[in-house]
Amino acid sequence: MKPRVRSEFVKSGYVFAKSPADIAKEYGFTEVAMLGSNENPYPPSDKVLRAAEAELSGVNRYPDPKAAAFHAALRTYICDCPVVTSGLGMDGVIETVIRTIVEPGDKVVISTPTFSMYGLAAKAASARVVNVSRSADFSVDLDTFLNEAKDARLSFLCTPNNPTGTVTPVEDIEYILDRIEGVLFLDCAYVEFSDINYLPLLSRDNLIIGRTMSKVYGLAGLRIGYAFVPEWLEAPYNIAATPFTMNRLSEAAASVAVSDAAYRESFIAHVQKWRDVFMQEIPFPVYPSGSNFILINVAPQKGDAAAESLAKHGVLVRSCTSFPGLGDTFIRVSVGADWENERFLAAVKKL
């Protein structure tokens, strides 16, 4: 008898960080330093919260299917070009792009180690997934990547990369775009924490730039992803997407958040300050990062063991053993609130 469930969904899926509630209960903490999911530790600004609250009385009605207010805000404050959205974060954008472009058996290339959703979503679409390893310093080896990506239907590259923090230079992206037959999805979820700007490359018709409201804008709980796309993709994407890609609260909050430069710049400065402190004070090899997190090699310890040891001190970090091609001696730590960062530094020095 043929199995009732597809094989892609039997073995494994997305790996979540350990629950803060579980750590608190297990080790007796009233507060846990939540540094495992690359979140913004601070709530949105009051004006963002007020915008969301104002929509509560209208939730009996469906939201705007075109998310016009949010799109207008993005074009005003970020980039005046075609944009698409998803109410399921960057994950939803990735899944919809794949649904729009990729047919069963098509080749999808992924620069690894990286965010697992590219591969999971591509396999769910019955694509032929090819992982291309980065160099020892986690930079992209252009020739190695292009050897596979040149004839791929769709390729994924994350910059700054999750979980390594590596920033790929603009000229390297241009080099890739000039030499591929298909489309490059550039995941820029963390780009605001770097000093790099890929938006001028959007004149290319084979580039998608994905971004999110979850990180610098502090709206992870609302699950808002968006992408700047070539004109030819905008209409097909919207046909392939699920109806109502944003709810009323998320559109209202996001529309105000993108205009709140003071909030954004304040958090970026906070991240950059603590990122430098982490680089200086962590007593293990760390890697340069253009993001709101740091990758740490805790060898000879294993990543799982180090994460568990830190949990005993009330600190939640991400063990990176689930990232293919990375090895089992790495952990990733996000920049949190001051007290969280201080607790982490005290704990990591005891490993």
Swiss-Prot record:
Transmembrane feature ranges: none
Pfam families, sorted: Aminotran_1_2
CDD domains in UniProt: AAT_like (cd00609)
E.C. number(s) listed in UniProt: 2.6.1.9
SUPFAM superfamilies, alphabetized: PLP-dependent transferases
GO BP term, pick one: L-histidine biosynthetic process
Annotated pathway: Amino-acid biosynthesis; L-histidine biosynthesis; L-histidine from 5-phospho-alpha-D-ribose 1-diphosphate: step 7/9
Catalytic activity: L-histidinol phosphate + 2-oxoglutarate = 3-(imidazol-4-yl)-2-oxopropyl phosphate + L-glutamate
InterPro entries listed in its UniProt record: Aminotransferase_I/II_large (IPR004839), HisP_aminotrans (IPR005861), PyrdxlP-dep_Trfase (IPR015424), PyrdxlP-dep_Trfase_major (IPR015421), PyrdxlP-dep_Trfase_small (IPR015422)
GO MF annotation, one: pyridoxal phosphate binding
Residues that bear N6-(pyridoxal phosphate)lysine: K215
Keyword set, alphabetical order: Amino-acid biosynthesis, Aminotransferase, Histidine biosynthesis, Pyridoxal phosphate, Transferase
Cofactor(s) required for function per UniProt: pyridoxal 5'-phosphate
NCBIfam families per record: hisC (TIGR01141)
PANTHER family for the chain: HISTIDINOL-PHOSPHATE AMINOTRANSFERASE (PTHR42885:SF2), HISTIDINOL-PHOSPHATE AMINOTRANSFERASE-RELATED (PTHR42885)
Family per record: Belongs to the class-II pyridoxal-phosphate-dependent aminotransferase family. Histidinol-phosphate aminotransferase subfamily.
Protein name per the record: Histidinol-phosphate aminotransferase
Organism: Methanocorpusculum labreanum (strain ATCC 43576 / DSM 4855 / Z)
